[in-house]
Design a protein with these regions (language model features):
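Extracellular/periplasmic head regions of type IV pilus-like filament subunits
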Residues: 54, 58-117, 125, 133, ...
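Generic hydrophobic-segment detector
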Residues: 7-10, 16, 51, 98, ...
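N-terminal single-pass transmembrane signal-anchor helix
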Residues: 2-30
Length: 138
């Protein structure tokens, strides 16, 4: 009888190890898919912001807005929502460090490097989008 209990314990431990391995792989894949979706969304959102800023400038003798909220206050609005005020949005924080009449520079940073995104995106006047790997402080 003692042998049967010993085998049952070993069997249970093997089952737990296999289930743990499967869960680990599943969680890693879920994170990869989420990161890919967040990154795709971040670059698309920055392009949307850039298009709104460029359209505003076309309608205002080439002058870009000095306040981001102007893009959502006009009727019709240039943007459906204020992405800067609603940050974080889908795993990314949005900011426009340079927003003046002569141009702009807006960026999207992952809320948690390597967990919600691996890239930092920046878009500047004219719609030039650049990206680089985020640096984790771990």
């Amino acid at each position: 009888m003692e042998d049967a209990r010993g085998i049952s314990f070993i069997t249970l431990m093997i089952i737990i190890a296999v289930v743990s391995l499967i869960l680990r792989i599943a969680v890693e894949q879920i994170i990869k898919v989420t990161v890919a979706q967040n990154e795709s969304g971040a670059s698309a959102t920055l392009k949307l912001i850039s298009t709104a800023l460029e359209n505003y400038a076309k309608d205002n003798q080439g002058a870009f807005p000095s306040n981001f909220s102007v893009l959502t206050q006009n009727n019709p609005s240039y943007l459906d929502k204020d992405y800067l005020a609603e940050s974080p949005f889908k795993g990314y924080n949005y900011s426009c460090l340079r927003l003046e009449a002569s141009g702009y520079s807006c960026s999207a940073n992952p809320t948690s490097c390597k967990l919600t995104g691996t890239m930092v995106y920046t878009i500047t006047t004219g719609g030039l989008l650049v990206w680089e790997k985020c640096e984790s402080n771990e």
